[in-house]
């Protein structure tokens, strides 16, 4: 998801990556600010945490956009670890909204293998792409399951839009990992797009909006 796209043959649906990054960053910042204003003093309905998650998402994508301009430890290691924390925060926000107990140690656990694997495979693009895509894909499905588990008692149709976005993002991530593992890889830069890279950032943008 958040590493250079290796599928250069899949160019029929490739958008401009810097534009998509800017889109995700701007939307995350604006929605985070809006939620912060709306939340006010409320701290227990998940919205305050959701605002923080959106801010972290903006920071993570800003670091990705700075690939080649800042040290790799920031644009690769920190960025991908923050993205794992974004999914963790999303899961916890859903649990908090549903009135379920906090499970921070559990939901943050995937950030540990992300940090370890990205550092180990810092110079191995293909392995890093597979590892990050699999872990983030599993986290996306986890967030989807958290919403699904209480769908019958949650009021509103917004949950279905969120589930659709999370399901699509998880699918794109896991398909990308599968293709990276099975196809020859030619390393290109993060700012060069391919079809799956485009779909990944588009689904990220959709989840932010939902």
At which residue positions do the language-model features occur?
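Hydrophobic transmembrane alpha-helical segments in integral membrane proteins
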Residues: 2-29
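Short aromatic-rich membrane-water interface segments that cap or initiate transmembrane helices
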Residues: 10-18, 193-204
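Juxtamembrane segments at transmembrane-helix boundaries
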Residues: 30-47, 61-198, 205
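Signal-transducing coiled-coil linker helices
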Residues: 204-210
């Amino acid at each position: 998801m958040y590493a250079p796209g290796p599928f250069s043959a899949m160019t029929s649906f490739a958008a401009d990556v810097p534009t998509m990054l800017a889109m995700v960053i701007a939307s995350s910042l604006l929605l985070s600010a809006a939620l912060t204003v709306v939340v006010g003093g409320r701290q227990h309905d998940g919205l305050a945490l959701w605002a923080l998650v959106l801010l972290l998402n903006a920071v993570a994508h800003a670091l990705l956009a700075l690939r080649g301009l800042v040290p790799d430890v920031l644009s690769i290691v920190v960025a991908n670890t923050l993205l794992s924390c974004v999914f963790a925060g999303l899961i916890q926000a859903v649990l908090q909204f549903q009135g379920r107990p906090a499970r921070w140690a559990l939901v943050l656990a995937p950030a540990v293998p992300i940090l370890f694997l990205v550092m180990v495979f810092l110079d191995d693009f293909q392995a890093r792409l597979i590892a990050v895509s699999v872990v983030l894909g599993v986290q996306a499905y986890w967030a989807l399951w958290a919403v699904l588990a209480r769908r019958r008692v949650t009021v509103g149709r917004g949950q279905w839009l969120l589930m659709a976005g999370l399901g699509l993002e998880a699918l794109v991530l896991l398909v990308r990992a599968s293709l990276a593992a099975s196809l020859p890889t030619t390393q290109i830069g993060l700012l060069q797009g391919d079809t799956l890279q485009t779909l990944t950032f588009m689904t990220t943008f959709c989840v932010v909006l939902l």
